[in-house]
Amino acid sequence: MTGRIRQARRRARQFGRIAEACCAGLLRLKGFRIIARDFRVPAGEIDIIARKGRLLAFIEVKARRSAAAEVLTAKQRKRIVRAAEAFMMTRPELAGLDLSFDLMLVGRWRRPRHLAGAWRPDR
């Protein structure tokens, strides 16, 4: 891998971390409590897990320097759902809450957009 590619990937990761932090801050302003960030299991990962009242949201952050409105693939959605299932097994006290799978879109110099209930698990 060339130095230029490595540097571009490093910048993209940094932009993604900043975008996730901005999204977490916006969610707090909207009354959510952040339960976890970067929850990872072999089955998948979730960027942000947040709770507001009886709602537990599993949030995927998509950060792009250009238009961020890229749709999640079915494979990506399945990995997020599997990670959510693994998370729920570790936190049985949250079992009675309503679940939401959300998407937050972040573009350069734009306020993050929160798409609540962006998709439903395929069952």
Regions found by a protein language model. Give the residues of each.
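Hydrophobic "anchor" residues on beta-strands that sit immediately upstream
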Residues: R33, L56, D98
